[in-house]
Amino acid sequence: MKVFKFIGLMILLTSAFSAGSGQSPMTVLCSIDWFMVTVHPFMLNNDVCVHFHELHLGLGCPPNHVQPHAYQFTYRVTECGIRAKAVSQDMVIYSTEIHYSSKGTPSKFVIPVSCAAPQKSPWLTKPCSMRVASKSRATAQKDEKCYEVFSLSQSSQRPNCDCPPCVFSEEEHTQVPCHQAGAQEAQPLQPSHFLDISEDWSLHTDDMIGSM
């Protein structure tokens, strides 16, 4: 009960911060398999532009999708030293840090980032035009926008594309082609769960419950 009260308090504080700043400098999204952090170049203040090469996630993971208005880190929850804590049978909290080291000044910052995800949730990414390679799956017409879905069963597969992971055929292990995200306008992602918690969590095997 205390855990859920704490989560509710942090959501309230996060909402208040976003409303006060006018634009959220950082967004954290996650699923049971993936962790995504989107950072605004003016994350510190309006006078300091942070360059993407001055940032890394966790244990040295650089942003893997850079745009003029945002830097995005998208990694598996088993990478970059991301920590996990099962707070219930249905909910896991993932946490790590964004490290900033200025190239022109001695300034350094460590910003904790966390996100809560249900243990059986799929990850829905932004629409991405694709052709489905497997006949056993629903097919999409050329240039039709489809939502990519991936979950824990595909965690052993690593697609090679710019956008977050494409759909794989589990029967044929065939990768669905995915257009690079840079060819599309950035569209806001709709998180099913959003949370930013500064408390440090550590991963213990015994904590991972049930379907983990």
UniProtKB/Swiss-Prot annotation:
Signal peptide: 1-22
Tissue specificity note: Expressed in placenta. Localizes primarily to differentiated syncytiotrophoblast throughout gestation as well as to a small population of villous cytotrophoblasts. Also detected in maternal blood and rapidly disappears following delivery, but is not detected in other adult or fetal tissues examined.
Example GO biological process: placenta development
Keyword tags: Developmental protein, Secreted, Signal
Family classification: Belongs to the PLAC1 family.
Upregulating conditions: Up-regulated during trophoblast differentiation and by FGF7 in trophoblast cells.
Gene: PLAC1
Localisation per UniProt entry: Secreted
Protein task: May play a role in placental development.
Membrane spanning residue stretches: none
GO (cellular component) term, any one: extracellular region
Major localization class: secreted
Disulfide bridges in this chain: none
Stated name of the protein: Placenta-specific protein 1
